[in-house]
Amino acid sequence: MAEIIGIDLGTTNSCVAVMEGGKVRVIENAEGSRTTPSIVAYTKDGEVLVGASAKRQAVTNADRTLYAIKRLIGRRFDDNVVQKDIKMVPYKIIKADNGDAWVEVKDKEGKSQKLAPPQISAQVLIKMKKTAEDYLGHEVKDAVITVPAYFNDSQRQATKDAGKIAGLNVKRIINEPTAAALAYGMDKKKGDRKIAVYDLGGGTFDISIIEIAEVDGEHQFEVLATNGDTFLGGEDFDLRLIDYLAGEFKKDEGVDLHNDPLALQRLKEAAEKAKIELSSSQQTDVNLPYITADASGPKHLNIRLTRAKLESLVEDLVERTIEPCKVAIKDAGLKVSEIDDVILVGGQTRMPKVQEAVKNFFGKEARKDVNPDEAVAIGAAIQGAVLSGEVKDVLLLDVTPLSLGIETLGGVMTKLIEKNTTIPTKANQVFSTADDNQTAVTVHVLQGEREMASANKSLGRFDLSDIPPAPRGVPQIEVTFDIDANGILHVSAKDKATGKEQSIVIKASSGLSDEEVEKMVKDAEAHRDSDRKFHELVDARNQADAMIHAAEKSVKDLGSEVSADEKSAIEKVVNELKEAMKGNDKDAIEAKRKALTEHSSKLAERVYAKKGGAAGAPPGGEAEGEPQAQAGGKKEDVVDAEFEEVKDEKKKDEDK
């Protein structure tokens, strides 16, 4: 069976891994890095950049450079957290027709283009897919993609949509802490252990309590409880620092950098760099010359930042991670002292203040033998190998992070599946009508822990109609909830009297209909096609350039031996080729290059013959004519070798 790759689709960085010969390998991207920035940029000439290249041009293209998109995936525009983000990012977040949070960028014609978060995330997944394909040497179709454990149903569905748009068959969506536990637990000694995975990434925080046990020779990974906050991560730490630096600058210079997208982007980069530096040093300087200007001239930002200052700015963010830890331990039915190991995942856990908070809560040092940037992708690759049958002794028992239920009389949420229930799972309950002769019921599906229906996340609603008229409380409507291994919910309602049934796969709030997803798949494929054509055009230009250089060199080497007619004929073809290279017609460039090749190959033969004679051939026309005759008798593909010969001879002359 073909490999199933593991992808950690992160808020800040993404990573891809694959299992080969029983070992997991994290794959380096084209730039040689094991992680890729989850950044997508749309340039003014219509190119789509992903990763390091997108990050590099962010300062000069701030409103078209999209980062931290994972914070918007599966979210409604009116969510408080989205509204907060709108004020903080240089790109434009808009309300889609269905109420979801989308992004608006200008295309190369300057027209507004609306993009759904799964569509943008798909570009990162395409890069991850290509990275794996370049390494493996063949096409990759199947993947396991990770999501934060505390992602709700619509966020999971939106992630699956992103995979589909990227041309991937998403075999499984698994939780990031569970993946990290797989990476940690696979090579550990036998025996039961209870571990806490503390995952503080770029945009989300998760805590999972996982029991690793040996059951009949199998590694069993059972998630006992999970908790978290899907809008708390390294980006929030950066924002605190950006606000502080902007505030200090405003105090000193009277200019608010929040109003200048270019300055804000430079400040973001500097804040991120300073935060990372302060994990290993006690102080750093944030130095940004010419950050902005006013009537009095250019302004420079130069602020000394200490680790203590940074820690005081983010103290409450670190503290916010502890409450979910308490809840998860309680839900798992354990005491803190019963946790054997603590694993840190996510780049933000490198901050000493975070490590100290974890140590104080769990009463032990976190393990350092797990790479916080790569563990999740490694775990996803292991799960991929389990699904493909390459690994046979692993059983993964994950849970649903939030309770699921429906709205009942009085605006109450009635839970059918409690949080931390092992998945896949199925539950049903019988409900009835609220009014006499009621012929239809609306099933409103909710996810969350609050008693009030309105305080929970609405996942979707559907109607069951044609119920025979009867007094209230008489009809029996059986509602069934079925969660698959991806944590995605299927709901059905059945009238027991008539057998009539209505069902729904919860995807309404992921915002994308099947038609929209299909359209985005086609768009992505078209984009891949245009990318391929672009690369072919660049290759054609490069080959043409090399041919022009070779022809001009031959003319120069032969000097006065080239007749005026020959020279003008070659110059004419060279000029025509240069003109073709300015355009975008690959075939025209190829045709002109071939014409130049025909002209220059004759010159090349003469250069070769001349050099051959100079290299010590016996005097006389016969010896000089031999290489000429041979070269003339052979096909064009010999021409390259002839040029090599010239270079070698030149080098020998230089060495002398």
UniProtKB/Swiss-Prot annotation:
Gene expressing this chain: dnaK
Record family assignment: Belongs to the heat shock protein 70 family.
Species whose genome carries this gene: Coxiella burnetii (strain CbuG_Q212) (Coxiella burnetii (strain Q212))
Compositional bias segments (type: Low complexity): 620-632
Stretches assigned to coiled coil: none
Swiss-Prot/TrEMBL keywords: ATP-binding, Chaperone, Nucleotide-binding, Phosphoprotein, Stress response
Main function: Acts as a chaperone.
Modified residues (Phosphothreonine): 204
Factors inducing expression: By stress conditions e.g. heat shock.
Name of the molecule in the record: Chaperone protein DnaK
GO molecular function: ATP binding; ATP-dependent protein folding chaperone; unfolded protein binding
Biased segments, Basic and acidic residues type: 647-656
Alphabetical list of InterPro entries matching this protein: ATPase_NBD, Chaperone_DnaK, Heat_shock_70_CS, HSP70_C_sf, HSP70_peptide-bd_sf, Hsp_70_fam
Highest taxon listed in the record's lineage: Bacteria
